[in-house]
């Protein structure tokens, strides 16, 4: 297969490495927006900034410049950009005939008081409706995928061709790829788990204990499921890799940037200093308000998400955010 990976950050490089090492012998091109970055990686045969010490295999080539020039004959284009850059990338890809899959997890920021923000497939439907597109998601850290450590991910798309392309390109002895038609559920899981991981990091940073962590993860999963079902997702999707799986990993893993946001805020660090220290995008910070707004427009109850938004906006201290959640009145566990 001929595979194009657009975006040379940690995730783009990790999947490019995985595809280039595939036993089927794929030809993989990693495209970088910055020509100097592409030249540096070409010379060093590694991404020294994000994945130092992991050499590029011979099947991986570097490119920059005109992305459209790479499309002819491509079997799959993987978009490895943050959510904020997805719209522009999809506009650039509007004439592409190969299957396209994005890696970003989140909601595009709302543009007005009446807008709740958009999931990736909703953005694509607006700006590039003819694309055969989908999402590639699930519980994974880029570093572990790049190292070839065992991982399971989900290829989500209503299009058989997109799911088949992702499975063919990336399913290997170290990376299991499961197919799912429910792109709404997969994207909601990927977006909301980042917000919930901030809450869990806050819990751990305040040393509230393992009971509290388990409660947050479980009730967070309920919030995620309620929002997803309201948006048309299948509830069983949230018991899978992109729901429960990604939530547990992001909420508990030490490599999680969103969890680290909560940890640092619990220590009294400002949000600005926290984001500056990360060096990478923490999508939960940018998605939290949009998730809360979309939920409000749909009448979906998401108290943990609302508390995270109040914390990020500076309206609640870490201790007050916890007190707000614990001070809520009794409710049925199976509330709909």
UniProtKB/Swiss-Prot annotation:
Predominant location: cytoplasm
EC number assigned by the record: 1.1.1.94
Biological process annotations from GO: carbohydrate metabolic process; glycerol-3-phosphate biosynthetic process; glycerol-3-phosphate catabolic process; glycerophospholipid metabolic process; phospholipid biosynthetic process
UniProt-annotated binding residues for NADPH: 11, 33, 105, 142, 257, 281, 283
Alphabetized SUPFAM superfamilies for the sequence: 6-phosphogluconate dehydrogenase C-terminal domain-like, NAD(P)-binding Rossmann-fold domains
Residues that bind sn-glycerol 3-phosphate: 105, 138, 140, 193, 246, 256-258
UniProt keyword annotation of Lipid biosynthesis present: yes
Keyword terms, alphabetized: Cytoplasm, Lipid biosynthesis, Lipid metabolism, NAD, NADP, Nucleotide-binding, Oxidoreductase, Phospholipid biosynthesis, Phospholipid metabolism
Location within or outside the cell: Cytoplasm
Uppermost EC category: oxidoreductase
Active-site residue list: 193 (proton acceptor)
Gene Ontology cellular-component annotations: cytosol
Alphabetized InterPro entries for the sequence: 6-PGluconate_DH-like_C_sf (IPR008927), 6PGD_dom2 (IPR013328), G3P_DH_NAD-dep (IPR006168), G3P_DH_NAD-dep_C (IPR006109), G3P_DH_NAD-dep_N (IPR011128), NAD(P)-bd_dom_sf (IPR036291)
Reaction equations catalysed: sn-glycerol 3-phosphate + NAD(+) = dihydroxyacetone phosphate + NADH + H(+); sn-glycerol 3-phosphate + NADP(+) = dihydroxyacetone phosphate + NADPH + H(+)
Pfam families, A to Z: NAD_Gly3P_dh_C, NAD_Gly3P_dh_N
Pathway stated in the Swiss-Prot or TrEMBL entry: Membrane lipid metabolism; glycerophospholipid metabolism
Molecular function as annotated in GO: glycerol-3-phosphate dehydrogenase [NAD(P)+] activity; NAD binding
The family this protein is said to belong to: Belongs to the NAD-dependent glycerol-3-phosphate dehydrogenase family.
Role of this protein: Catalyzes the reduction of the glycolytic intermediate dihydroxyacetone phosphate (DHAP) to sn-glycerol 3-phosphate (G3P), the key precursor for phospholipid synthesis.
Name of the molecule in the record: Glycerol-3-phosphate dehydrogenase [NAD(P)+]
Gene: gpsA
């Amino acid at each position: 297969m001929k595979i194009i990976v657009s975006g040379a950050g940690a995730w783009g490089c990790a999947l490019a490495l995985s595809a280039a090492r595939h036993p089927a012998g794929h030809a993989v091109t990693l495209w970088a927006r910055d020509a100097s970055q592409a030249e540096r990686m070409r010379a060093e045969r590694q991404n020294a900034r994000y994945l130092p010490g992991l050499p590029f295999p011979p099947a991986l080539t570097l490119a920059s410049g005109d992305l459209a020039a790479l499309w002819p004959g491509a079997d799959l284009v993987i978009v490895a950009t943050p959510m904020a850059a997805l719209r522009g990338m999809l506009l650039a890809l509007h004439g592409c005939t190969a299957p396209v899959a994005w890696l970003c997890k989140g909601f595009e920021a709302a543009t007005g008081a009446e807008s709740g923000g958009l999931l990736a497939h909703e953005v694509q439907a607006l700006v590039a409706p003819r694309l055969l597109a989908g999402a590639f998601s699930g519980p994974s850290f880029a570093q572990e995928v790049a190292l070839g450590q065992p991982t399971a991910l989900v290829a989500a798309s209503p299009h058989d061709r997109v799911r088949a392309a992702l499975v063919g390109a990336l399913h290997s002895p170290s990376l299991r790829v499961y197919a799912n038609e429910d792109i709404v559920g997969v994207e909601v899981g990927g977006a909301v788990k980042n917000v919930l991981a901030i809450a869990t990091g806050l819990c751990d940073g305040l040393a509230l204990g393992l009971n509290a962590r388990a409660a947050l993860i479980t009730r967070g999963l309920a919030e995620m499921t309620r929002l997803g079902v309201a948006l048309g997702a299948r509830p069983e999707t949230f018991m899978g890799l992109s729901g429960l799986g990604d939530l547990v990993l992001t909420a508990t893993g030490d490599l999680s940037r969103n969890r680290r946001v909560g940890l640092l805020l619990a220590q009294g660090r400002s949000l600005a200093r926290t984001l500056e220290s990360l060096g990478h995008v923490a999508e939960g910070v940018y998605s939290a308000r949009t998730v809360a707004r979309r939920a409000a427009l749909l009448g979906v109850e998401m108290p943990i998400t609302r508390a995270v938004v109040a914390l990020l906006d500076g309206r609640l201290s870490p201790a007050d955010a916890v007190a707000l959640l614990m001070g809520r009145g009794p409710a049925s566990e199976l509330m709909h």
